[in-house]
Amino acid sequence: MAPKAEKKPAAKKPAEEEPAAEKAEKALAGKKPKAEKRLPAGKAEKSSGEGKKAGRKKAKKSVETYKIYIFKVLKQVHPDIGISSKAMSIMNSFINDIFEKLAGESAKLARYNKKPTITSREIQTSVRLVLPGELAKHAVSEGTKAVTKFTSA
């Protein structure tokens, strides 16, 4: 029995070493399957990355619009009248177009005068140049009133 006992501890020692080596290999091998498991998780991360892109798309969807302000003005002028989403979209694009025209004209005026900043004076002049007749006069008076209110507050 003594030889058997010697064989068992001797067998256990290499067996212990082998399981340790196997455990190390299994740990490495275990990491590989974990990495393989992470690949689908990576795919999930990619899909969550797409979700981030979708989040970015949502951020792009939250582009500033004038819809709230158009609606407020509509309710001031005609409290009982609503507006369709298509009409609201048209009004929003109209205001964006006017804004771009005024900004472009103001930038040209600043360049002509060799000034690095666009001031209220350039804006006022560009309003007079871009908008026709009475509309320009009303816009200038409302703009002046708004600037005065802003500076006094």
From Swiss-Prot:
One of its GO terms (molecular function) is DNA binding. Residues 1-28, 36-53 have a biased composition (Basic and acidic residues). InterPro entries: Histone-fold, Histone_H2A/H2B/H3, Histone_H2B, HISTONE_H2B_site. Keywords: Acetylation, Chromosome, DNA-binding, Isopeptide bond, Nucleosome core, Nucleus, Ubl conjugation. Its main location: nucleus. Can be acetylated to form H2BK6ac and H2BK33ac. Monoubiquitinated by BRE1 to form H2BK143ub1 and deubiquitinated by UBP26. Required for heterochromatic histone H3 di- and trimethylation at H3K4me. May give a specific tag for epigenetic transcriptional activation. Residues 1-61 are annotated as: Disordered. It holds the Pfam family Histone. There is a cross-link at K149 (Glycyl lysine isopeptide (Lys-Gly) (interchain with G-Cter in ubiquitin)). It comes from the Eukaryota. The modification N6-acetyllysine is found at K7, K37. One of its GO terms (cellular component) is nucleosome. Belongs to the histone H2B family. The nucleosome is a histone octamer containing two molecules each of H2A, H2B, H3 and H4 assembled in one H3-H4 heterotetramer and two H2A-H2B heterodimers. The octamer wraps approximately 147 bp of DNA. Core component of nucleosome. Nucleosomes wrap and compact DNA into chromatin, limiting DNA accessibility to the cellular machineries which require DNA as a template. Histones thereby play a central role in transcription regulation, DNA repair, DNA replication and chromosomal stability. DNA accessibility is regulated via a complex set of post-translational modifications of histones, also called histone code, and nucleosome remodeling. This is Histone H2B.10. It comes from Oryza sativa subsp. japonica. The gene is H2B.10.
